[in-house]
Curated annotation (Swiss-Prot):
Protein name: Thiamine-phosphate synthase
SUPFAM superfamilies on file: Thiamin phosphate synthase
Domain of life of the organism encoding this protein: Archaea
EC number: 2.5.1.3
Chain residues that bind 4-amino-2-methyl-5-(diphosphooxymethyl)pyrimidine: 36-40, 68, 106, 135
Catalysed reactions, as listed in the record: 2-[(2R,5Z)-2-carboxy-4-methylthiazol-5(2H)-ylidene]ethyl phosphate + 4-amino-2-methyl-5-(diphosphooxymethyl)pyrimidine + 2 H(+) = thiamine phosphate + CO2 + diphosphate; 2-(2-carboxy-4-methylthiazol-5-yl)ethyl phosphate + 4-amino-2-methyl-5-(diphosphooxymethyl)pyrimidine + 2 H(+) = thiamine phosphate + CO2 + diphosphate; 4-methyl-5-(2-phosphooxyethyl)-thiazole + 4-amino-2-methyl-5-(diphosphooxymethyl)pyrimidine + H(+) = thiamine phosphate + diphosphate
Organism: Pyrococcus furiosus (strain ATCC 43587 / DSM 3638 / JCM 8422 / Vc1)
GO term, biological process aspect, one: thiamine biosynthetic process
């Protein structure tokens, strides 16, 4: 499997905008190459049930499936990987518990990016590229900060934070392997169409 290729258009769920299952189905129809289930403060059983359904859907569309934060849920639903932030389980511990999971690390600076790569992350989610409503306290690194990270690490980098169809091109031109979006897809009236538009831009720039 070519991980870089599978990270091109990475769509993250947000139940404040849309229920998970239907929106993920539409995003996959629109060409999402990876899905991350991001559910904060839900019972583990609920996360497990939704995760199982999303795992099935992503398999049907040959997309990668990641779970945010929860290594246990990722293992239970047979996800491809887990996304870990600075306050989540340490990367090296997750690798020990779940050696077969693809580990993505959320990083907000060049220092954090280098540290995550050293600890064994398989790819980075780097941002926030622009200010974002989804995470109002996010540190903004801008296109320049993103470019520095891309130039300094060997592992794939996915850009995140305030990315939409209007700025996706300039983000992709920094050399990233893909873009991660929440509001640009989950906040759209037509999830499938919004995903298709972004996929078209991704293909134009990355091929």
């Amino acid at each position: 499997m070519n991980l870089r290729n599978k990270l091109k258009l990475y769509v993250i769920t947000d139940r404040r905008l849309k229920p998970e299952v239907e929106s993920v189905r539409e995003a996959l129809e629109g060409g999402a190459t990876a899905i991350q289930m991001r559910i904060k403060n839900a019972p583990t059983r609920e996360m497990y049930e939704i995760g199982k359904t999303l795992r099935q859907l992503t398999r049907e569309y040959d997309a990668l499936f990641f779970v945010d934060d929860r290594v246990d849920v990722a293992l239970a639903v047979d996800a491809d990987g887990v996304q870990l932030g600075p306050e989540d389980m340490p990367i090296e511990v997750a690798k020990e518990i779940a050696p077969n999971l693809i580990i993505g690390a959320s990083v907000y600076s060049l220092e954090e990016a280098l540290e995550a790569e050293k600890k064994g992350a398989d790819y980075l989610g780097a941002g926030s590229v622009f200010p974002t409503k989804t995470k109002e306290d996010a540190r903004v690194i801008g296109l320049e900060g993103l470019r520095k990270i891309v130039e300094s690490v060997k592992i794939p980098v996915v850009a995140i934070g305030g990315i939409n169809k209007d700025n996706a091109r300039e983000v992709l031109k920094t050399g990233v392997d893909g873009i991660a979006v929440i509001s640009a897809v989950m906040g759209a009236e037509d999830v499938r169409k919004a995903t298709e538009e972004l996929r078209k831009i991704v293909e134009e720039v990355l091929g």
